[in-house]
Every structure is written in structure tokens, then in C-alpha cells.
């Protein structure tokens, strides 16, 4: 079974915004990933909001879905009970709905890896206790 890459907001925005701090890293990483990357609607909503806030067009984000690079592979309605449980468990982290959806997506796949800039994913656990593998710039590059 192949690894499933789950895309978070930060790398998607960094990939699409040339001026973003992690643009180069996001582009280099994207070039190594095998589509489709899985994501959820809250991540897309966050990304669209951030893109607009920075004066960027949201069309390239939607084009990633249209081209099959991103796949919306999640239903909040179907996964409502586990999402509520995750958000209660990580109340102290102020877990967002987007993060809860990504953790739940990681729980639904045997070999997940979350592509993120969010250090909270170092704390979150799938299925209660399993570390979630992440794709994240190393700590030195995050300080630059």
C-alpha cells in the first residue's frame, strides 16, 4: 500500500505564493509528491482566505483540484463524532476544524503523511497514540 499525503493549509499557500517564506521548500516538496494529495474543505477555505488576504487569486488553488493534484477526500457530516472527540481531546491546543479533519484523514489511512508547516502536528496523535508522520521543513529552515 502506498503512502497517502495529506495536504494542510500552510504548504498549499506557500506553493502558490512566490513571496511566501517557504515557497521554495513547498515547490521542491510538491515536485516529489505523487498526486492526488488528500485534503478537506476546511483546509481549502483557510487557504482561500489567506490567499485573498495577501491579494492573491484563489483560482490556482481551485485548479489544483480540477487537475487532480488535490482530492477532497473527507465528509465532515460522516465524520462528525470523531471530529468532536478530537477537538475535545486537543482543546488545550485550540485545534482548528481543519486540523481535526486532517488528523481524522490520517486515522482513515494506513500510511498517512501530513504535509504541513504547523508544529501542532508534532503533538497530535492518530488513533489516540500513534505519531502522525509529517513532511515539514527542518527546524533551521523555519527560523530563517
Where are these regions (language model features)?
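Residue-level signal for well-ordered alpha-helical positions
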Residues: 18-19, 50, 86, 127
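Short, well-structured N-terminal submotif of metal-dependent ribonuclease cores
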Residues: 1-39, 51-63, 135, 139-143
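Active-site neighborhoods of divalent-metal-dependent phosphate/nucleic-acid chemistry enzymes
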Residues: 73-115, 119
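Acidic, PIN/NYN-like endoribonuclease modules and their adjacent C-terminal/linker elements
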Residues: 2-4, 72, 108-144
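A generic structural signal for short hydrophobic patches within well-formed alpha-helices
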Residues: 12, 44, 121-122
Amino acid at each position: 500500500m502506498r503512502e497517502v499525503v495529506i495536504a494542510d493549509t500552510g504548504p498549499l499557500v506557500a506553493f502558490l505564493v512566490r513571496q511566501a517564506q517557504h515557497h521554495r521548500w513547498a515547490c521542491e516538496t510538491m515536485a516529489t509528491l505523487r498526486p492526488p494529495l488528500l485534503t478537506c474543505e476546511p483546509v481549502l477555505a483557510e487557504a482561500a482566505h489567506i490567499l485573498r488576504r495577501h491579494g492573491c487569486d484563489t483560482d490556482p488553488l481551485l485548479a489544483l483540484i480540477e487537475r487532480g493534484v488535490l482530492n477532497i477526500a473527507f465528509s465532515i457530516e460522516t465524520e462528525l463524532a470523531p471530529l468532536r472527540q478530537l477537538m475535545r481531546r486537543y482543546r488545550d491546543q485550540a485545534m482548528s476544524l481543519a486540523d481535526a479533519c486532517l488528523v481524522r484523514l490520517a486515522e482513515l489511512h494506513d500510511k498517512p503523511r501530513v504535509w504541513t508547516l504547523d508544529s501542532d502536528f508534532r503533538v497530535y496523535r492518530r488513533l489516540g497514540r500513534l505519531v502522525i508522520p509529517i513532511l515539514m521543513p527542518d527546524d533551521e529552515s523555519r527560523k530563517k
